[in-house]
């Protein structure tokens, strides 16, 4: 229903203004693009990854944002999932089947497509909070963080895949997951 009277109109305008301010901004000259390592030069062994448990197969990314996109709708998902280094060029991602990234992977598999994935490491804690908070699927984690911060998140386009990442990320990893590609974690 439309707002009735000045008070309701003012409250509606305030919410609309907050939403407008919270929209993500695109950064054309992002700090995360200052140093780019090509795929052939990539060695994940150079990343400062922790081994959380002595029997773990390799180091793990802690508090990295995992960014995927629904292959049908293009709606992004940002989550915090366990990422473990398996080799100099590969990592595993461990997500629960009910989470957004896992849903995107199932859809990509049904379409016989690879799922593009980006990992943003060294981001503002507010972005980690937004990614870890259960919010409705229709609400973007970027918009949620912007609403909380009172200003839009600064994003930039990835170099090799069609995803956006926080432009002030310290490290961005870009890659893809092939349907059916599974490894022990």
Predicted segments, located by residue:
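Extended, highly charged
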Residues: 1-185
């Amino acid at each position: 229903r439309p707002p009735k009277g000045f008070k309701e109109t003012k409250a509606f305008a305030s919410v609309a203004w907050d939403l407008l301010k919270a929209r993500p901004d695109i950064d054309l000259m992002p700090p995360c693009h200052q140093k780019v390592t090509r795929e052939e030069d990539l060695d994940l062994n150079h990343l400062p990854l922790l081994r959380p448990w002595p029997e773990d197969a390799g180091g793990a990314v802690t508090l990295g944002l995992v960014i995927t996109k629904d292959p049908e709708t293009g709606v992004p998902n940002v989550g915090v999932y366990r990422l473990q280094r398996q080799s100099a060029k590969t990592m595993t991602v461990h997500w629960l089947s009910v989470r957004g990234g896992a849903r995107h992977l199932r859809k990509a598999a049904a379409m016989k497509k690879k799922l593009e994935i980006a990992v943003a490491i060294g981001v503002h804690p507010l972005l980690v909070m937004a990614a870890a908070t259960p919010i409705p699927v229709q609400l973007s984690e970027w918009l949620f963080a912007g609403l909380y911060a009172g200003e839009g998140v600064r994003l930039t386009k990835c170099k090799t895949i069609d995803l956006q990442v926080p432009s002030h990320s310290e490290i961005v990893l870009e890659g893809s997951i092939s349907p059916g590609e599974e490894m022990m974690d």
